């Protein structure tokens, strides 16, 4: 715990690694967990597939758990 799953448009490996390290650091500082407890995955989604797979396939079905949606706070 925690497991952070990210879905995003394709990026190069260096960018994905930097983002994962920054997210890991935030969880270490804010969540207070050990480094061994953190798992982060990144799945690339083609822009043409985004709405079908992610927007309507996941986001719209899970709106009640969204903390930030379309760049706006939902808390």
Please identify what each model-predicted range represents:
Residues 2-75:
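A domain-level signal for the structural core that forms small-molecule/cofactor-binding pockets
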């Amino acid at each position: 715990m925690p497991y952070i799953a990210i879905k995003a448009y394709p990026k190069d490996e260096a960018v994905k690694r930097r983002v994962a390290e920054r997210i890991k650091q935030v969880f270490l500082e804010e969540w207070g967990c050990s480094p061994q407890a953190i798992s982060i995955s990144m799945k690339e989604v083609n822009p043409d597939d985004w709405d079908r797979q992610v927007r309507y396939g996941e986001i719209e079905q899970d709106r009640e758990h969204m903390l930030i949606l379309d760049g706006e706070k939902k808390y």
